UniProtKB/Swiss-Prot annotation:
Record field: catalytic activity: 1-(5-phospho-beta-D-ribosyl)-ATP + diphosphate = 5-phospho-alpha-D-ribose 1-diphosphate + ATP
Pathway: Amino-acid biosynthesis; L-histidine biosynthesis; L-histidine from 5-phospho-alpha-D-ribose 1-diphosphate: step 1/9
Entry protein name: ATP phosphoribosyltransferase
Keywords, sorted A to Z: Amino-acid biosynthesis, ATP-binding, Cytoplasm, Glycosyltransferase, Histidine biosynthesis, Magnesium, Metal-binding, Nucleotide-binding, Transferase
GO biological process terms, semicolon-separated: L-histidine biosynthetic process
Length: 291
């Protein structure tokens, strides 16, 4: 019997970013209308769309072999799963998000202990309850169905526990962060039995390798340039690289071709410096994956 890896794709805010990431790895996932079972161009994988909040529970219980979800939702469900890989990406950025405790700007609440006996609104109910229990602070934790930031403004809660990447929504609602509760990022997780299966483990290792390579590729760019012999040492010394830059002599010339990989955020400052040192014909190109 042909084996298939039952794989969960997070539905909602992470869905588009996940599908785009898989595409860069060579897997095309096609979501057909309202179907919860997308097509994928790999006969070894069967996909299912599932909310990130439910993913860990379904992987733990074996409904799915593996899936992608946030570290926060694994903690919320207290799920016993195998973490195959940490993958730092989200709908908005390539950095971890944070669950924070926030109150109104003009609130007298300044520290965690000031929340004793108060009402806290959040979607992350179970983790929040455990957090305050460990701190020995008695609070009333209420589940929020959405628009959590407005709960403080409307007087329905004294504080909220909410996820943020840029803090822009927090600031827009005139809220003030009093504590960072946890950092979270996407994780590739597997059911323990699936991880023991040689076929499924090998497939998951392949997925993890390529996803991590694609994420690293997003942060880096390649640079090629022609460099005169007289300026070669000075230019090579300017260049960061995964290892060392590749240097090759040009045919019947006193020039060299130099190629390297650099951080995409530093290249804007690096290119003028390279030109000042004599580099010519500089080409910057994107990297699909860096393994």
């Amino acid at each position: 019997m042909t084996q298939v890896l039952k794989f969960g794709i997070p539905k909602g805010s992470l869905q588009d970013a996940t599908i785009a990431l898989f595409k860069r790895c060579g897997w095309k996932i096609n979501v057909n209308g309202r179907s919860y079972f997308p097509d994928i161009n790999d006969p070894d994988i069967s996909c299912a769309l599932l909310r990130a909040q439910e993913m860990a529970r379904n992987v733990e219980h074996g409904t799915l072999d593996a899936g992608l979800t946030g570290k926060d939702w694994i903690a919320e469900n207290n799920s016993d799963v195998h973490v195959v890989a940490d993958l730092v990406y989200s709908k908005a950025s390539a950095r971890p998000a944070r669950w924070v405790i926030a109150v109104a700007k003009d609130s007298p609440i300044q520290k965690l202990e000031d929340l004793e006996g108060k009402t806290v609104s959040t979607e992350l109910v179970n983790y929040t309850k455990r957090f305050f229990q460990e701190k020995k602070i008695s609070v009333n934790v209420e589940f929020s169905w959405g628009a959590t930031e407005a709960k403080v403004v409307s007087g329905l809660a004294d504080a909220i526990v909410e996820i943020t990447e840029t803090e822009s929504t927090i600031r827009a609602h005139s809220l003030r962060i009093i504590h960072e509760m946890m950092q979270t990022h996407t994780q590739l997780i597997a059911n323990h039995d699936a991880w023991k299966d040689p076929f499924k483990k090998a497939k998951l290792e392949q997925i993890a390798l390529l996803l991590k390579g694609a994420l690293l590729g997003e942060k880096l760019v390649g640079l090629k340039m022609n460099v005169p012999h007289a300026g070669l040492d000075a230019i090579v010394n300017l260049l960061p690289s995964l290892n060392a830059p590749t240097v090759a002599p040009l045919y019947q010339s006193d020039w060299f071709a130099v190629e390297t990989v650099v951080d995409s955020e530093t290249v804007r400052d690096l290119i003028p410096e390279l030109m000042a040192k004599g580099a010519q014909g500089i080409i910057e190109y994107p990297l699909n994956k860096v393994i």
